[in-house]
Amino acid sequence: MMKSIILTLNDRAEGVTADGTRVPRALPGEEITLSKENQFKIVLPSKDRITPVCTHYKSCGGCSIQHVTQSFIKEWKSNVIKSCLSARGIETIIKPILTSEINSRRRVTLHGMKTKKSVTVGFFKKNTHELISTPSCELVDPEILSAFSLFEEITLLGATRKSIIEISVTVSKAGLDLNILNGKKLENQSIMKITALCENFNVARITWNEDLLANFLNPTIEFQGIAITPPPNAFLQATEEGQEILIENAMLSVFNSDKVIDLFSGCGTFTLPAAKRSEVLAIDKTKSMLSAIEQAWRETSGLKKVTSRSQDLFKEPVGKEELNSFDSAIIDPPRVGAEAQSRELAQSHIKRISSVSCNPKTFSRDAKILVDSGFKLDWVQPIDQFLWSSHIELVAQFSR
């Protein structure tokens, strides 16, 4: 055993020693003994260390930083954003981080497997394919947890012994929206059993291997009061509270715009609220999400004109000439960011950009492109929808 002191916490929530050894779940300032297998024991704990709230924390890979105070997490996540921007030579106002409540996660992906003797539904152990049962979870909405026995029955009826099924669950206004992947082909009797079970557990819709199994009610979601029925397994923000904070801040940048372009629009999280005051063009690769936007727009009175277009913005970013016809832009790319699209925005005449990101590194890379072209990064608002993990969401305003 070797004694070490943890110097810092990296952006994956791992403690780091002087020689660069990464120690998961160790904290800065702690004195530890470290084995050759990278197993550690605490000799002198950090003043910020606390007892994890979840009974599954030691084995579950869903959370990585339940062992530390919320004040530490807030400061650390804010510093991650600040460090990423500083590395690109960018300084700005970073607003106080806003954190979602416990048990507010409305979207979750569970996995299920069965053997001759048992059924297991839950999350994987960290960095493994070993599944552990997690009938309780401090992150997840209670409505999802109350249907845990349903997920076990679905696994029993729909999984093979050679594969693990994926159970994606979203809490909608009408009930649970279930999307099952990697399930076996169901016989009519199994379909009848599963649909009957779903009716007893307030399920609005269930799809099986991308085919609709049953639609009891339309699983609607609201964006600032505008109802939409997203396609199965559509991207949505993790918590409703976090979603509304992102929308509120994103609208600050486009408030006085006549025409707005929403890049990587998804199913309209920002498109539809922006349409309360502006004409909006929504662009995304996924046609089913654009169809959901169009339907919601048709069914909602009082909105300005919304149009949509299917386009792969990685392969074919919207060019500066087209961008010049818009007053402002909203951009919410995946974790890889939007380098090519940012270069087009930088060369356009657009005056304001609302940028939403779930990755401070790629956000900072793209921000550098915009700042170098004359944009100012006015502020960044961090939102922590992913309690006890290394993930952080942010929304930011660029202007010139």
What does each model-identified segment do?
Residues 162-171, 206-209:
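A short glycine-rich, hydrophobically flanked beta-strand micro-motif that places a catalytic Asp/Glu
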Residues 2-13, 183-400:
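Rossmann-like S-adenosyl-L-methionine
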Residues 1-56:
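Terminal RNA-binding accessory module
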Residues 44-51, 58-164:
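Extended interfacial segments that mediate partner engagement and assembly in macromolecular machines
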Residues 95-101, 166-167, 211-212, 381-385:
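Short, solvent-exposed loop/turn elements at beta->coil junctions and helix N-caps
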Residues 169-183:
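Carbohydrate-binding surface patches
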